UniProtKB/Swiss-Prot annotation:
GO terms for cellular component: nuclear inner membrane. This is Probable C-mannosyltransferase DPY19L4. Pfam families: Dpy19. The chain crosses the membrane at residues 15-35, 124-141, 147-165, 210-226, 232-248, 255-273, 279-300, 312-333, 384-404, 429-449, 452-472, 485-505. It is a multi-pass membrane protein. It comes from the Eukaryota. One of its GO terms (molecular function) is mannosyltransferase activity. It is found in: Membrane. Its EC number is 2.4.1.-. Belongs to the dpy-19 family. Probable C-mannosyltransferase that mediates C-mannosylation of tryptophan residues on target proteins. Keywords: Acetylation, Glycosyltransferase, Membrane, Transferase, Transmembrane, Transmembrane helix. The modification N-acetylalanine is found at A2.
Amino acid sequence: MAEEEDVLFQRFAKIFIGCLAAVTSGMMYALYLSAYHERKFWFSNRQELEREITFQGDSAIYYSYYKDMLKAPSFERGVYELTHNNKTVSLKTINAVQQMSLYPELIASVLYQATGSKEIIEPVYFYIGIVFGLQGIYVTALFVTSWLMSGTWLAGMLTVAWFIINRVDTTRIEYSIPLRENWALPYFACQIAALTGYLKSNLNTYGERFCYLLMSASTYTFMMMWEYSHYLLFLQVISLFLLDIFSVEQSDKVYEVYKIYIFSLFLGYLLQFENPALLVSPLLSLVAALMLAKCLQLNVKKGSFVAKIIKVINFYLVCTLTITLNIIMKMFVPHKENGHMLKFLEVKFGLNMTKNFTMNWLLCQESLQAPSQDFFLRLTQSSLLPFYILVLIICFLSMLQVIFRRINGKSLKETITLEDGRIGERPEIIYHVIHTILLGSLAMVIEGLKYIWIPYVCMLAAFGVCSPELWMTLFKWLRLRTVHPILLALILSMAVPTIIGLSLWKEFFPRLMTELMELQEFYDPDTVELMTWIKRQAPVAAVFAGSPQLMGAIKLCTGWMVTSLPLYNDDDLLKRNENIYQIYSKRSAEDIYKILTSYKANYLIVEDAICNEVGPIRGCRVKDLLDIANGHMVCEEGDKLTYSKYGRFCHEVKINYSPYVNYFTRVYWNRSYFVYKINTVISFQS
């Protein structure tokens, strides 16, 4: 009896210390982000306009709608104005909530007003505080996932350490707080933690129910927070499908997870204003195909030749049904969603060539290119990449070993002990190996996906070096005889992470402290002057035209209407962006005037940084991409060069001579910006 009490006490103490460490890690990371953000932007010493300028591009748009919700007389009125928004983009009414996934802003505005925070904290601090808090939950979820897989909270501590040290590659929170991924990925991390626990073979009934409920809630929330979430869940379903093939024992559990996806898609479709993108998504087609195939599956003796044939037929059936269902859905469901994404992928993988400005501009973005050598060097210097590769190889080979044993009809143990050394037989390990390979393969093509992949690299590497099972699997292969393998595995699972942790502390902790001590300065006086002039001098009904990134800042800082936005999920907005960018091309004053007046623009803003851009890669500057699209620059051999008799508009308009002064009158300028009033009555001067 006393022994049982001791065991229960030890287990409780282990869980308590682990939970305390997980929560503390998340809280410390959130506080670190807050302190670093203050040091970088000096928020507490700045005026509201100067704070808002720190939100760049699409981040400015998201935060501007949060401000609009707080200004609305009621929540219902605020939602209505966002869903029928005609005060942002000229000549266009948009459902901003659906198109931009503004559910985070709706929730943040409700919480701000419902909690009475208006008297305590400014709206901007409340907003970024929620995001930093979610990042703390993100880190806590990664901690728990690694802990569940390895059995020791030491793995969670190492996961957090690697995550923070490699934060340049794990998160974009430092550069752009309101991004959808910063709101969504913490819920995805919670979902993966719950899924990991749910897939474990030794979980009790209450644990399964808790994990299932947490998985359901986090899957749905993740889907609501980010418009691209269903693509990430699609990769997850592929991983679960392959797990179902390789691990017969988990078939029923995997089928229950499929129901979560169907429920989340159905609820998301209704609450996202009947979003057609969810109906035509590959996620829905694949899950529906898997559930249909499950209904048609025959019960035969496991390990028999017939069972193997049925597995192959089932795989082929699922693939065929998925493609068929997706084609049928696209035939009957009207949609325009993400057509530009397919075109981009065609060009990215060399399946098509284009001179289109938007496609080439996207290809030139650093986040959409292949990873650089610096990326791999950073991961190697922090010791993350070498240990990840080691852990992945051992788990992958062990998984293959288990698969071949199944193919040969050999029975597997119901309970796996440490002495067996078969880490690849655990269903949660099989899932994570497949998932990380899929994510890693995509991240090798598109660098921006590293922010999804690297956090799980941290988690998997930390789990591996802290897992006695992984070391035991390696020793089984090496047939170690000199030292007792179980004892050595237990020692290494404690010693290796301790040595890694101490080396990381010695090398990187002083750097983190130095970053918090250093006062950085982000100040853009030219943009502040421009926004101040607009608010004081421009008519309230004025419409501004310029680069999409600048238009986002104008919408946030002034509230004035603009002609375009830095959003890339709408074909009309993409076309607008391309047309407005023509102010940096070799087009006539009359052409530019017609383009701008077609969007009812009253003012044009020319940015000196774009007009005189000296980019590191020739052909990736905005003016080069425009010249290629307009045929004024040779892109490939055999292209026909079209000579333009006009100079570059952004240069010519500054000189103030006819015909440019007939159409445009300069009303304001500073070192970075030139503002021109678009004349309604054209006066021709000689």
